[in-house]
Design a protein with these regions (language model features):
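A conserved mid-protein helix/loop that constitutes part of the nucleotide-sugar donor-binding site
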Residues: 17-22, 207, 211-232, 241, ...
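A short, well-ordered alpha-helix in the C-terminal region of glycosyltransferases
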Residues: 198, 344, 351, 358-372, ...
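A short, active-site helix/loop in glycosyltransferases that binds the activated sugar's phosphate group
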Residues: 146-172, 180-184
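Conserved acidic donor-binding segment of nucleotide-sugar-dependent glycosyltransferases
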Residues: 330-331, 335-342, 351-357
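Nucleotide-activated donor-binding/catalytic signature segment of Leloir-type glycosyltransferases, i.e.
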Residues: 254-278
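Aromatic "clamp/platform" in nucleotide-sugar-dependent glycosyltransferases that forms part
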Residues: 279, 298
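N-terminal strand-loop element at the rim of the active site
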Residues: 6-14, 18-72, 160, 164, ...
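Short hydrophobic beta-strand element within catalytic cores of glycosyltransferases
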Residues: 315-318, 328
Length: 400
């Protein structure tokens, strides 16, 4: 039975954890899998409950963190080398940047025959300055040469990585979309809506816009907050903005909201315009309480929040970046705005707020669209097929 060593940066809320967890739990019994994870930052919400609920028992690399630290990174490398020597995997599959760097080097130097890496996003624009971005790009090109295959999670991401950024030749890439348990978003909508709105002091007639994600620069919450303030001044409807998540920019975003004369709260919307809820782990219970899900990022891979919003049949407004056009049905489940264009974003948000029939139309196709493409059963089937194919190619080469 082929052995798969799966290495993930850290167990924080987001697509990579779900991807690694579902693959580790549900991939074909033809493979034996060991899940290894680094450590999350203190400011991040843990997603360890996801692997715990699936009955997984990952091994933790205590020195592997998101931030670059040569001493800790070298120690993490040595820990991974030891695990590889003990487990003797046929396949090492890494997820996200830090795990991809340390894990692929360790696997290559230990002679692991099949090495894969999944890009859950990339940092080749909108994250760093030109020099730092160039360094990271050259590192990824070097690591790609050590890899058997590179997995992209959308066709747009593949095009960016192989054609625009030339990380590796296009034939080295395979597209395997993310996978989730999406049926849980279809349960008890009316009850969940009432409970969420009662918890946060929202009236049933309030029109509630929500955004879900880390409060970090790349997510560009400033754009949404400013657009919300502009739309609020133009509509007769009672608007509320729910910001779900946490991170380094929380205090700055609160100050920015104040500067726009918006009233904020961490608990209730009774006398507030904007509520910062921090993280909500049972997001399937929160989404029915929203009327619109927004995303305002400068850059994205395959944002989980938009997949989940469609699974819950919630209309979307988003910037047109990264793999988002692959995820939504523009004009049927979502409206898209050009990157960081406040005028366009505000105009389209106002249209979505004012047009009740448009929002109703956007609730029809969401679940069907994402279930066909992003169920965890499809993810596991597609990845199992890829593993089997690569293992068969390896066996044939060994015989020759």
């Amino acid at each position: 039975m082929p052995k798969v060593l799966r290495i993930i940066n850290r167990l924080n809320l987001g697509g990579p954890t779900y991807n690694a967890a579902y693959l580790s739990k549900y991939i074909s019994d033809d493979f034996e899998t060991l899940l290894v994870a680094g450590m999350k930052d203190e400011s991040e919400a843990s997603s360890a409950y996801i692997v715990d609920n699936l009955g997984l028992k990952p091994r933790y690399i205590k020195n592997m963190y998101r931030e670059i630290n040569p001493i800790k990174d070298f120690r993490a490398y040595k820990e991974l080398v030891q695990i590889i020597k003990e487990f003797q995997p046929d396949i090492v599959h890494t997820h996200a940047a830090k795990a991809g760097a340390i894990g692929r080097l360790a696997a290559y130097n230990c002679g692991v025959p099949i090495i894969l890496h999944t890009f859950h996003g990339h940092v080749f624009h909108s994250y760093f300055g030109q020099l730092k971005t160039r360094i990271f790009l050259e590192i990824e090109r070097f690591l790609a040469r050590k890899s058997t295959k590179i997995v992209a999670i959308s066709n747009i991401q593949k095009q960016e990585l192989c054609e625009q950024f030339k990380v590796a030749p296009c034939e080295k890439f395979e597209v395997v979309p993310l996978g989730f348990d999406l049926e849980r978003f279809q349960i008890n909508h009316p009850e969940r809506r009432r409970a969420f709105r009662a918890k946060y002091g929202l009236n049933q007639e309030d029109l509630v816009i929500g955004i879900i994600g880390r409060l970090v620069p790349i997510k560009n919450h400033h754009l949404l907050i400013q657009a919300f303030a502009e739309v609020q001044a133009k509509t007769q409807k009672t608007l509320k903005l729910i910001i779900i998540g946490d991170g380094e920019l929380r205090e700055e975003l609160e100050r920015f909201s104040h500067s726009l004369k918006l009233k904020i709260s961490n608990r209730t919307a009774v006398k507030s315009d904007v509520v910062f809820t921090s993280w909500i782990t049972d997001i399937e219970s929160a989404l029915p309480g929203l009327d619109i899900v927004a995303l305002s990022s400068f850059n994205e891979g395959t944002p989980v929040s938009l997949i989940e919003a469609q699974a819950a049949n919630i209309p979307i407004i988003s910037t047109r970046v990264g793999g988002i056009e692959d995820i939504v049905l523009e004009g049927e489940t979502a409206v898209l705005s050009e990157n960081n264009n406040l005028e366009e974003f505000s105009t389209k948000l106002l249209d979505l707020v004012e047009d009740d029939s448009l929002r109703r139309r956007f609730t029809i196709k969401g679940f069907e669209h994402v279930y066909e493409r992003y169920s965890y059963t499809n993810l596991c089937s597609n990845m199992s097929t890829l593993y089997t194919s690569l293992n068969q190619e390896r066996t044939i080469k060994a015989k020759n």
